[in-house]
Amino acid sequence: MVTIKVNNLIDFVAEVFSHSESSPEEARRIATYLTTANLTGHDSHGVIRVPVYIRWKKTGNVVPNQTPEIVVDTPSLAVVDGKFGYGQTVTPFAVRTGIEKCKKAGLAAVALRNAGHIGRVGDWAEMAAAEGLVSVHFVNAAGSLLVAPYGGVQKRLSTAPYCVGIPRQGQDPIVLDFATSIVAEGKVLVASRGGKKLPTGALVDADGTLSEEPSVLYGPYTPDGPRDHTQGTGAIRAFGEHKGSGLAFICELLGGALTGTGATSGGRQFANGMLAFYVDPKVIDTSNYFDEEISRYTDFIRETKPIAGVESVLVPGDPERKMRAERTRNGVPLPDDTWAAIVNTAREVGVSEASIQRATS
């Protein structure tokens, strides 16, 4: 395990993307969002993605420095084509569009199509919450067959994230952000690179056997080699049986089919689609009841007596706040295999040995 200071990690990852044709501004933006995912404890959406992103750039699956385009524009609705730009570039544009429309109309919807990997969806809910807005996000990943629907063994769904953000007055927002599978694909990636092990039965093999071995999804792999989910015989399982499977299906239809990205299928270019709704609570809540009631109910939930083995009952966003404070203070821990893969990628794009050494100093 190697632990890297937050600013060092951002600087190093930004240098990797700068060496791969991203502008300095885009490179730092990508690095900051990826590192922020690590800070919140979501290592699956953090810097472990660097080798994948660079591989996608080399194969033309993602385009550096892309300018998204608004292709449908009404007072309360927009469709944004990301043109396969990095998600960390095109998604903020789409979210800002939704925020601006919502502040004028009180309610807005924005469909983002053809985006590169948009990272931790909670970032975009937090962005809206910082402007005082509630947001709901339905996301799919076209070209990313990973998850077996309830009762099946074959990959038919993406991990299809769902996210809700609720602003608080003078406090961090409440953010619920989860893949509709038992684990996100990035969690399998983390486990395959020496990180946290998968929950029992998170995967299902072609014969219906439940497993927690990453090779079920990726097939055989070497410690610092690539991971390819098309090579494994199995799939990730949907969470909550028919409920998670059903929600994933809806995310595919709204985040994928309705946005124009397309519901996921094999043999096509990867792209995230996101349908996001934005609501200004001040338009609805003219008596300022909303935030007071959130405070009351949040306290009511947290005061629940925990079962044996559980320290305390939490609400969405609590684990991320705790982890962010800890890692901001102590640095970001990365398994040796994860760091080795990132360093190998850095060398491939021409980052100097001095920069590599400086990252861990």
Regions found by a protein language model. Give the residues of each.
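Acidic, glycine/proline-rich low-complexity segments that act as flexible tails and inter-domain linkers
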Residues: 1-6, 11-30, 35-36, 43-64, ...
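Catalytic-core signal marking the mid-to-C-terminal active-site face
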Residues: 3-12, 19, 258, 263-361
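Active-site cofactor/substrate anionic-group-binding motifs, chiefly glycine-
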Residues: 45-101
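Residues forming anionic-ligand binding surfaces in small-molecule and nucleic-acid pockets
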Residues: 70-77, 81, 93-108, 212-232
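A generic, well-ordered mixed alpha/beta core segment in the N-terminal half of proteins
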Residues: 78-169, 175-181
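Phosphate/diphosphate-binding glycine-rich loops and adjacent basic-rich segments that engage nucleotide
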Residues: 147-223
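Secondary-shell segments that build the walls of catalytic and ion/ligand-binding clefts
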Residues: 197-263
